[in-house]
Amino acid sequence: MGQTIITNDGRFEWDEVKNIQNIEKHGIDFNFAIKVFDDEDKIEEYDDFHSTYNEERYRVVGMVDNDILFVVETELESGRIRIISARYAEKIYVDKYFLLRGKNYDF
């Protein structure tokens, strides 16, 4: 496990080694991915399949700079959000985002 990075506002954290691996694999930096939480139309869902007794995980799908991102996170006892992974959303989640929000794909 690498160094834990905490954002200046204390709202988010992540493992920096995991962030570097995520950038290499998906091309998304966690510092960029946290902007998904600013999207008022974001979709947040409990991830029952990947959650455990010790860690509840959530999927967040939202728009950042005209791209739809898929972020996996967990909420810590402190209230801070820990980013686990981030990638560009697959078509099924892009479709769901626009369908639920009544938006067009034109951007």
How should each PLM-predicted stretch be described?
Residues 1-107:
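Ribonuclease/tRNase effector modules and their secretory precursors
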